[in-house]
């Protein structure tokens, strides 16, 4: 498959400097809402018709959906795969598979990829489109791409020119302004044994998406652990600034045994994530999360790739024991589709430290969410591979990719983060009061 490099993506080859990158011109922005969707995806179908033209996404809930319920029925439940890929026929489809997907097909005979008809189901409220159009000609990156300015309540860079701009679209991706879920994080070891890493309640907010007021915070999360028993009562809070070039992530933990809140500056980058019992790094969260200061991010281009998509069966309808199987998730429950993705390569900066020397990210053109990643070790060998399981909230509407997982190709362990099918699903909520995002409030949230 030929890589589709746009003339804008070609600009990513230019060396980065500390100077600000300029916003796009008004003439360039005219493509939004015409040949491009309001957030920057190609409207047209692909040449073969295997990717349809964008028609506005899915905004009507299917039969069986109950307003206010956290569980969302599968609107495509009756469909059958149009193609099944396994190790035997992988070569015929290799150009549309990530390196991680190919590695899993080669490593595990039971792993397969069931490719279903493509549905461009992602949709957004009109105000997201309107604000994205405003941002397009004003938003800029600063501090080697690690900060942004001139953007609010819309995607900052619908027509990206650099890898940093594309990754900012992912970092601020719209899942709704605020939401809550009871979740489980689970690990499956090389022997096939499933272990609970953590479970609890997650409250997430994106103050960036508040159209009524500007904020210097783009994302914040509060986790209250209810299990396993030895972790019950612990709590964690993270607040990420829009200006990550000059400001650090703020993070706190509460340990009930000590009965005090501690500042936790190390909850970032390649620190092992206690939420997954160390199976992933902190910046593996949501495929990528946090500051971009450890890597150089290059926008490679756009390509048609087979990625997890419309995974309502796995995210909302599955049972834990049915979904988690030895070596990998149950292929019967994972839906893959052909979509256009932006490819961003991240290379470790000289003088910086990280367990990964290189990373490749695959960003969905319709949502800007990272749907897959490949992570390489210090020797340049493929080490881990990650996938996010898109299941849009058609009732809002908004994308949703907070169930994600990583496969460790060395230890043969894999993790699944954000399993919500048996714990009430995802509920969109009103933002918490600012006082709930303080250290004192974190201490009060931890209960045993």
Q: What spans do the regions from the language model cover?
A:
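Generic serine detector
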Residues: 17-18, 25, 110, 121, ...
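Gly/Pro-enriched, hydrophobic low-complexity segments
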Residues: 23-24, 29-56, 98, 222-292, ...
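Solvent-exposed N-terminal domain segments of exported/luminal and surface proteins
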Residues: 26-248, 255
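Short, surface-exposed, charge-dense and proline/glycine-enriched linear segments
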Residues: 74-82, 209-215, 294-300, 403-420, ...
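Long, C-terminal catalytic modules of enzymes
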Residues: 422-448
């Amino acid at each position: 498959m030929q890589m589709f490099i746009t003339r804008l993506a070609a600009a990513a080859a230019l060396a980065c400097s500390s100077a600000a990158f300029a916003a796009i011109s008004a003439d360039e922005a005219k493509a939004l809402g015409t040949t491009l969707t309001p957030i920057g995806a190609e409207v047209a179908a692909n040449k073969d018709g295997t990717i349809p033209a964008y028609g506005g996404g899915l905004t009507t809930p299917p039969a069986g959906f109950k307003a206010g319920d956290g569980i969302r029925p599968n609107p495509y439940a009756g469909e059958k795969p149009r193609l099944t890929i396994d190790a035997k026929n992988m070569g015929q489809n290799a150009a549309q598979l990530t390196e991680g997907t190919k590695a899993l097909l080669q490593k595990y005979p039971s792993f397969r990829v069931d490719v279903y008809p493509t549905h461009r189901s992602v949709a957004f409220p009109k105000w997201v489109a309107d604000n994205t159009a405003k941002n397009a000609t004003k938003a800029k990156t600063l501090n080697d791409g690690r900060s942004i300015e001139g953007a609010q309540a819309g995607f900052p860079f619908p027509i990206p020119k650099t890898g940093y701009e594309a990754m900012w679209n992912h970092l601020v991706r719209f899942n709704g302004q605020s939401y809550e879920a009871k979740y489980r994080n689970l690990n499956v070891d090389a022997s096939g044994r499933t272990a609970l890493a953590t479970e609890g309640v997650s409250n997430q907010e994106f103050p960036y998406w508040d159209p009524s007021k500007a904020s210097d915070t783009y994302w914040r999360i509060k986790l209250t652990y209810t299990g396993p028993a030895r972790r019950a009562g612990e709590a964690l809070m993270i607040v990420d600034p829009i200006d990550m070039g000059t400001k650090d992530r703020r993070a706190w933990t509460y340990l009930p045994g000590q009965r005090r809140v501690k500042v936790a500056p190390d909850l970032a980058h390649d620190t092992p994530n206690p939420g997954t019992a160390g199976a992933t790094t902190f910046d593996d969260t949501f495929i990528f999360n946090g500051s971009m200061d450890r890597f150089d991010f290059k926008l490679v281009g756009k390509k048609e790739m087979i990625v997890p998509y419309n995974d309502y069966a796995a995210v909302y309808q599955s049972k834990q024991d049915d979904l988690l199987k030895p070596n990998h998730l149950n292929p019967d429950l994972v839906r893959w589709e052909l979509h256009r993705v932006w490819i961003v390569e991240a290379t470790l900066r000289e003088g910086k430290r990280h367990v990964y020397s290189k990373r490749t990210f695959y960003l969905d053109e319709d949502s800007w969410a990272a749907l897959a990643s490949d992570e390489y070790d210090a020797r340049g060998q493929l080490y881990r591979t990650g996938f996010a399981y898109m299941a849009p909230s058609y009732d809002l509407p908004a994308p949703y990719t907070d169930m994600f997982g990583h496969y460790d190709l060395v230890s043969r362990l894999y993790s699944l983060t954000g399993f919500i099918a048996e714990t009430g699903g995802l509920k969109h909520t009103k933002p918490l009061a600012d006082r709930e995002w303080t250290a004192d409030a974190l201490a009060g949230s931890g209960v045993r």
